[in-house]
Amino acid sequence: MLMQTSQGQSGSAHVVVMGNEKGGSGKSTTALHIAVALLKAGQRVATIDLDCRQQSFTRYINNRRAWARRTGLDLELPVHCCIKLGETMQIADNESSEFQQFMDAVSAVERTFDFIVIDTPGSDSYLMRLAHSMADTLVTPINDSFLDFDVLGTVDPATYSVTGESHYAEMVRDTRRKRRQLDGASTDWIVVRNRLSMLGSRNKQLVADGLKELSFRLGFRSIDGFAERVVYREFFPRGLTALDDLDEATLGTRPSLGHVTAREEVTSLLRQLKLPLDERGRRRAANRAEWFTQVDKPLEVHDILGA
Protein backbone atom coordinates (compact mmCIF):
# COMPACT_ATOMS: atom_id res chain seq x y z
CA MET A 1 0.00 0.00 0.00
CA LEU A 2 2.73 2.43 0.98
CA MET A 3 6.02 2.68 -0.84
CA GLN A 4 9.13 1.88 1.16
CA THR A 5 11.99 4.33 0.80
CA SER A 6 14.94 5.13 3.01
CA GLN A 7 14.22 7.19 6.10
CA GLY A 8 16.32 10.23 6.77
CA GLN A 9 19.22 9.93 9.16
CA SER A 10 18.25 12.87 11.33
CA GLY A 11 16.03 10.78 13.57
CA SER A 12 13.19 13.25 13.20
CA ALA A 13 9.66 12.26 12.25
CA HIS A 14 8.55 12.71 8.65
CA VAL A 15 6.04 15.59 8.66
CA VAL A 16 2.95 15.29 6.44
CA VAL A 17 0.91 18.51 6.22
CA MET A 18 -2.60 18.85 4.80
CA GLY A 19 -2.90 22.34 3.35
CA ASN A 20 -5.48 24.33 1.41
CA GLU A 21 -6.89 27.80 2.07
CA LYS A 22 -10.34 26.64 0.97
CA GLY A 23 -12.49 24.55 3.29
CA GLY A 24 -14.51 21.50 2.29
CA SER A 25 -11.78 19.98 0.13
CA GLY A 26 -11.40 16.76 2.14
CA LYS A 27 -8.31 17.64 4.19
CA SER A 28 -9.49 15.93 7.38
CA THR A 29 -10.76 12.84 5.57
CA THR A 30 -7.49 12.49 3.68
CA ALA A 31 -5.47 13.15 6.84
CA LEU A 32 -7.12 10.34 8.81
CA HIS A 33 -6.82 7.88 5.93
CA ILE A 34 -3.09 8.65 5.71
CA ALA A 35 -2.64 8.31 9.49
CA VAL A 36 -4.53 5.00 9.67
CA ALA A 37 -2.65 3.62 6.65
CA LEU A 38 0.65 4.42 8.35
CA LEU A 39 -0.50 2.85 11.61
CA LYS A 40 -1.57 -0.30 9.77
CA ALA A 41 1.92 -0.37 8.23
CA GLY A 42 3.41 -0.48 11.72
CA GLN A 43 4.55 3.14 11.83
CA ARG A 44 4.40 5.25 14.98
CA VAL A 45 2.07 8.11 14.11
CA ALA A 46 1.22 11.36 15.89
CA THR A 47 -1.43 13.76 14.62
CA ILE A 48 -1.93 17.48 15.23
CA ASP A 49 -5.04 19.54 14.48
CA LEU A 50 -4.27 23.21 13.84
CA ASP A 51 -7.83 24.08 12.85
CA CYS A 52 -8.61 25.53 16.27
CA ARG A 53 -12.18 26.50 15.33
CA GLN A 54 -13.59 23.68 13.20
CA GLN A 55 -11.56 20.79 14.70
CA SER A 56 -12.92 18.36 12.09
CA PHE A 57 -9.79 16.20 12.29
CA THR A 58 -10.07 16.01 16.08
CA ARG A 59 -13.75 15.08 15.94
CA TYR A 60 -13.00 12.40 13.35
CA ILE A 61 -10.41 10.83 15.66
CA ASN A 62 -12.68 11.17 18.71
CA ASN A 63 -15.47 9.46 16.76
CA ARG A 64 -13.08 6.62 15.94
CA ARG A 65 -12.11 6.24 19.59
CA ALA A 66 -15.76 6.24 20.68
CA TRP A 67 -16.76 3.65 18.05
CA ALA A 68 -13.89 1.37 19.07
CA ARG A 69 -14.96 1.62 22.70
CA ARG A 70 -18.62 0.99 21.87
CA THR A 71 -18.02 -2.03 19.62
CA GLY A 72 -14.95 -3.48 21.31
CA LEU A 73 -13.04 -3.28 18.03
CA ASP A 74 -9.28 -2.73 18.01
CA LEU A 75 -9.15 0.30 15.73
CA GLU A 76 -5.75 1.90 15.25
CA LEU A 77 -5.49 5.35 16.84
CA PRO A 78 -2.71 7.92 16.58
CA VAL A 79 -1.39 9.99 19.47
CA HIS A 80 -3.37 13.18 18.90
CA CYS A 81 -3.12 16.83 19.92
CA CYS A 82 -5.55 19.63 19.13
CA ILE A 83 -4.23 23.17 19.44
CA LYS A 84 -6.60 25.28 21.53
CA LEU A 85 -7.78 28.61 20.20
CA GLY A 86 -6.28 31.68 21.89
CA GLU A 87 -9.09 33.52 23.69
CA THR A 88 -7.58 36.83 24.76
CA MET A 89 -8.41 40.21 23.24
CA GLN A 90 -4.85 40.56 21.94
CA ILE A 91 -4.01 38.91 18.61
CA ALA A 92 -0.30 38.78 19.46
CA ASP A 93 -1.01 36.98 22.75
CA ASN A 94 -3.28 34.48 21.01
CA GLU A 95 -0.69 33.74 18.35
CA SER A 96 2.00 33.35 21.00
CA SER A 97 -0.14 30.87 22.96
CA GLU A 98 -1.03 28.84 19.87
CA PHE A 99 2.59 28.86 18.69
CA GLN A 100 3.84 27.56 22.05
CA GLN A 101 1.22 24.79 22.08
CA PHE A 102 2.25 23.75 18.58
CA MET A 103 5.95 23.75 19.39
CA ASP A 104 5.33 21.72 22.54
CA ALA A 105 3.23 19.21 20.59
CA VAL A 106 5.89 18.78 17.91
CA SER A 107 8.76 18.57 20.41
CA ALA A 108 6.95 15.85 22.35
CA VAL A 109 6.79 13.49 19.37
CA GLU A 110 9.34 14.44 16.72
CA ARG A 111 12.12 12.16 18.04
CA THR A 112 10.04 9.15 19.07
CA PHE A 113 7.51 8.87 16.23
CA ASP A 114 7.98 7.98 12.58
CA PHE A 115 5.35 10.36 11.19
CA ILE A 116 3.50 13.50 12.23
CA VAL A 117 0.31 14.20 10.26
CA ILE A 118 -0.86 17.82 10.58
CA ASP A 119 -4.23 19.18 9.48
CA THR A 120 -4.35 22.94 8.90
CA PRO A 121 -7.27 25.39 8.78
CA GLY A 122 -8.85 26.45 5.50
CA SER A 123 -7.60 30.02 5.92
CA ASP A 124 -4.32 31.89 6.01
CA SER A 125 -2.83 32.08 9.49
CA TYR A 126 0.52 32.20 11.24
CA LEU A 127 0.29 28.55 12.36
CA MET A 128 -0.79 27.42 8.91
CA ARG A 129 2.28 29.03 7.35
CA LEU A 130 4.55 27.61 10.05
CA ALA A 131 3.24 24.09 9.43
CA HIS A 132 3.80 24.47 5.69
CA SER A 133 7.41 25.47 6.32
CA MET A 134 7.94 22.26 8.33
CA ALA A 135 6.38 19.90 5.78
CA ASP A 136 8.41 17.07 4.29
CA THR A 137 5.30 16.08 2.34
CA LEU A 138 2.62 18.69 1.61
CA VAL A 139 -0.76 17.35 0.50
CA THR A 140 -3.20 19.85 -1.01
CA PRO A 141 -6.62 18.30 -1.68
CA ILE A 142 -8.89 20.22 -4.05
CA ASN A 143 -12.35 19.44 -5.34
CA ASP A 144 -12.33 18.73 -9.05
CA SER A 145 -13.66 22.06 -10.30
CA PHE A 146 -12.34 25.43 -11.41
CA LEU A 147 -13.91 26.94 -8.30
CA ASP A 148 -11.36 25.00 -6.24
CA PHE A 149 -8.63 25.25 -8.88
CA ASP A 150 -8.67 28.97 -8.11
CA VAL A 151 -6.86 28.30 -4.83
CA LEU A 152 -3.81 27.42 -6.94
CA GLY A 153 -4.08 29.55 -10.04
CA THR A 154 -6.18 31.57 -12.46
CA VAL A 155 -7.25 30.61 -15.98
CA ASP A 156 -8.30 32.41 -19.13
CA PRO A 157 -12.13 32.23 -19.38
CA ALA A 158 -12.03 31.50 -23.11
CA THR A 159 -9.09 29.11 -23.49
CA TYR A 160 -8.81 27.78 -19.89
CA SER A 161 -5.04 28.15 -20.10
CA VAL A 162 -3.28 29.11 -16.87
CA THR A 163 -2.72 32.85 -16.54
CA GLY A 164 -1.23 33.13 -13.05
CA GLU A 165 -0.64 31.71 -9.58
CA SER A 166 -2.82 32.32 -6.55
CA HIS A 167 -1.89 33.80 -3.18
CA TYR A 168 -1.77 30.30 -1.64
CA ALA A 169 0.43 28.89 -4.41
CA GLU A 170 2.85 31.80 -4.03
CA MET A 171 2.94 31.24 -0.26
CA VAL A 172 3.80 27.55 -0.74
CA ARG A 173 6.51 28.38 -3.28
CA ASP A 174 7.99 30.92 -0.86
CA THR A 175 8.00 28.54 2.13
CA ARG A 176 9.54 25.74 0.03
CA ARG A 177 12.31 28.08 -1.12
CA LYS A 178 13.03 29.23 2.43
CA ARG A 179 13.08 25.61 3.61
CA ARG A 180 15.71 24.72 1.01
CA GLN A 181 17.80 27.72 2.02
CA LEU A 182 17.49 26.85 5.71
CA ASP A 183 18.36 23.15 5.80
CA GLY A 184 18.65 21.99 2.19
CA ALA A 185 15.51 19.87 2.48
CA SER A 186 12.96 19.65 -0.30
CA THR A 187 9.20 19.51 0.30
CA ASP A 188 7.32 17.03 -1.87
CA TRP A 189 4.13 18.89 -2.83
CA ILE A 190 1.21 16.76 -4.01
CA VAL A 191 -2.10 18.16 -5.23
CA VAL A 192 -4.89 15.60 -4.77
CA ARG A 193 -8.04 15.84 -6.90
CA ASN A 194 -11.01 14.91 -4.71
CA ARG A 195 -14.73 14.44 -5.39
CA LEU A 196 -13.92 13.17 -8.84
CA SER A 197 -16.89 12.45 -11.06
CA MET A 198 -17.09 8.80 -12.03
CA LEU A 199 -18.09 9.94 -15.53
CA GLY A 200 -15.79 11.61 -18.01
CA SER A 201 -16.56 15.23 -18.85
CA ARG A 202 -15.03 18.19 -20.64
CA ASN A 203 -14.69 20.07 -17.35
CA LYS A 204 -12.87 17.14 -15.76
CA GLN A 205 -10.35 17.07 -18.61
CA LEU A 206 -9.91 20.85 -18.55
CA VAL A 207 -9.13 20.79 -14.82
CA ALA A 208 -6.64 17.97 -15.39
CA ASP A 209 -4.96 19.93 -18.20
CA GLY A 210 -4.83 23.06 -16.04
CA LEU A 211 -3.21 21.19 -13.15
CA LYS A 212 -0.65 19.65 -15.49
CA GLU A 213 0.29 23.08 -16.83
CA LEU A 214 0.40 24.61 -13.35
CA SER A 215 2.48 21.73 -11.97
CA PHE A 216 5.35 22.70 -14.28
CA ARG A 217 5.23 26.27 -13.01
CA LEU A 218 4.95 25.42 -9.30
CA GLY A 219 6.71 22.06 -9.03
CA PHE A 220 3.98 19.85 -7.58
CA ARG A 221 2.70 16.38 -8.44
CA SER A 222 -0.99 15.97 -9.27
CA ILE A 223 -2.73 12.69 -8.43
CA ASP A 224 -6.29 11.41 -8.28
CA GLY A 225 -7.86 11.15 -4.84
CA PHE A 226 -11.37 10.23 -3.77
CA ALA A 227 -14.43 10.08 -6.01
CA GLU A 228 -17.76 11.55 -4.95
CA ARG A 229 -19.05 8.65 -2.82
CA VAL A 230 -21.59 8.47 -0.02
CA VAL A 231 -19.42 6.03 1.94
CA TYR A 232 -16.82 8.71 2.76
CA ARG A 233 -19.50 10.81 4.44
CA GLU A 234 -20.82 7.74 6.25
CA PHE A 235 -17.36 6.98 7.68
CA PHE A 236 -17.12 10.21 9.70
CA PRO A 237 -19.67 9.61 12.54
CA ARG A 238 -17.91 6.34 13.43
CA GLY A 239 -14.40 7.52 12.68
CA LEU A 240 -13.87 4.79 10.13
CA THR A 241 -11.75 4.66 6.99
CA ALA A 242 -11.87 2.64 3.79
CA LEU A 243 -8.86 0.71 5.12
CA ASP A 244 -10.68 -0.78 8.12
CA ASP A 245 -12.22 -4.25 7.97
CA LEU A 246 -15.12 -4.24 5.54
CA ASP A 247 -17.50 -6.28 7.65
CA GLU A 248 -20.79 -5.54 9.36
CA ALA A 249 -19.26 -5.56 12.86
CA THR A 250 -16.85 -2.77 11.94
CA LEU A 251 -19.02 -0.72 9.60
CA GLY A 252 -22.24 -1.05 11.59
CA THR A 253 -23.97 -1.88 8.31
CA ARG A 254 -23.64 -4.38 5.49
CA PRO A 255 -20.64 -3.62 3.27
CA SER A 256 -21.35 -2.58 -0.30
CA LEU A 257 -19.48 -2.35 -3.56
CA GLY A 258 -18.93 1.33 -2.74
CA HIS A 259 -16.84 0.33 0.30
CA VAL A 260 -14.66 -1.95 -1.83
CA THR A 261 -14.18 0.68 -4.54
CA ALA A 262 -13.36 3.33 -1.94
CA ARG A 263 -10.63 1.08 -0.52
CA GLU A 264 -9.12 0.71 -3.99
CA GLU A 265 -9.11 4.50 -4.41
CA VAL A 266 -7.46 5.08 -1.05
CA THR A 267 -4.87 2.37 -1.64
CA SER A 268 -3.97 3.94 -4.99
CA LEU A 269 -3.71 7.39 -3.42
CA LEU A 270 -1.43 6.22 -0.63
CA ARG A 271 0.84 4.38 -3.04
CA GLN A 272 1.27 7.52 -5.13
CA LEU A 273 2.13 9.64 -2.08
CA LYS A 274 5.37 7.62 -1.77
CA LEU A 275 5.69 8.15 1.97
CA PRO A 276 8.88 6.69 3.49
CA LEU A 277 8.50 3.59 5.66
CA ASP A 278 11.24 2.02 7.74
CA GLU A 279 11.76 -1.73 7.99
CA ARG A 280 11.18 -1.76 11.76
CA GLY A 281 7.68 -0.45 11.20
CA ARG A 282 7.00 -3.12 8.60
CA ARG A 283 8.10 -5.79 11.08
CA ARG A 284 5.82 -4.31 13.76
CA ALA A 285 2.89 -4.50 11.36
CA ALA A 286 3.71 -8.10 10.43
CA ASN A 287 4.01 -9.13 14.10
CA ARG A 288 0.72 -7.44 14.93
CA ALA A 289 -1.05 -9.20 12.06
CA GLU A 290 0.41 -12.55 13.15
CA TRP A 291 -0.74 -11.97 16.73
CA PHE A 292 -4.31 -11.31 15.62
CA THR A 293 -4.20 -14.41 13.42
CA GLN A 294 -3.15 -16.55 16.37
CA VAL A 295 -5.74 -15.00 18.69
CA ASP A 296 -8.48 -16.13 16.32
CA LYS A 297 -7.23 -19.74 16.40
CA PRO A 298 -7.95 -22.31 19.15
CA LEU A 299 -4.96 -23.41 21.21
CA GLU A 300 -3.20 -26.52 19.96
CA VAL A 301 -2.19 -29.32 22.32
CA HIS A 302 1.52 -28.47 22.04
CA ASP A 303 0.72 -24.84 22.94
CA ILE A 304 -1.00 -25.98 26.14
CA LEU A 305 1.75 -28.43 27.09
CA GLY A 306 4.51 -26.01 26.13
CA ALA A 307 6.04 -28.51 23.72
Give, region by region, the residue ranges found by the protein language model.
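C-terminal lobe/tail of nucleotide-utilizing enzymes
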Residues: 1-10, 181-307
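P-loop/Walker-type NTP enzyme "switch/lid" segment
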Residues: 15, 19-25, 37-116, 122, ...
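Hydrophobic positions on the alpha1 helix immediately C-terminal to the Walker A/P-loop
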Residues: 30
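Active-site signature of alpha/beta-hydrolase-fold catalytic machinery across serine-
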Residues: 33, 37, 130
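Conserved catalytic-core segment of NTP-binding enzymes
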Residues: 41, 121-224
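Short aromatic-enriched loop/helix-cap "lid" or pocket-rim segments at secondary-structure transitions
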Residues: 58-61, 151-154, 203-204, 235-239
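Short, hinge-like loop/turn segments at secondary-structure boundaries
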Residues: 63-67, 157-159, 241-243
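Short, flexible/disordered intra-domain loops and linkers
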Residues: 88-97, 150, 199-205, 253
